[in-house]
């Protein structure tokens, strides 16, 4: 969409920008931490530390998907998450996976080899450092985005201080799908490496502002969206 201002015979127009409407989703926002947190400084509600149960929480969301799962993850070697992906595939869920090709990704040896995987490799833009899952993007009541700082590795989940953020919102899920499919190179089940874009090669094509459960949420993808400036 764009804004156009007209005064007499003169007019000016803004650049074309993507926008998202408010969805009919539940609108929950849940944040979890892999290590203990100091709740003495909480101002609204106490943060929740899942500890070694973080992988089970991620696995539960994966297996809750009914139709589609798009996963973009820097690295994976956690058995609970691997098994959850296998369960989703066995349940008929369409699963697509983007991985950083320079990592070990040892977990793939335990995942159903029918799952299509697109590896970001040298010559395909900068490294793929995402950690997100989009579930059931076309179902307003079940759509979710799971993201955060943690890789899907046992070390990141059980030892390192990390976080997991889960949002139940279809508009956000569709925005993440735009980002996923730009790296995937297609809208189908098979990736198109010739059309895939990573890093600075990506377009600025995702909405930035959302209203989720009555709370304003902003979305930025590095390096194209001016993420550092938005944080500052």
For each of these PLM feature ranges, what is it?
Residues 1-8:
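Beta-strand-rich modules
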Residues 14-96, 101-115, 135-232:
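Charged, low-complexity intrinsically disordered terminal segments
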Residues 120-125, 155:
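Short Gly/Pro-enriched turn/cap motifs at secondary-structure boundaries
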Residues 127-129, 214:
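Extracytoplasmic
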Residues 132:
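Internal, well-ordered alpha/beta segment that forms a basic, Gly-enriched binding/recognition surface
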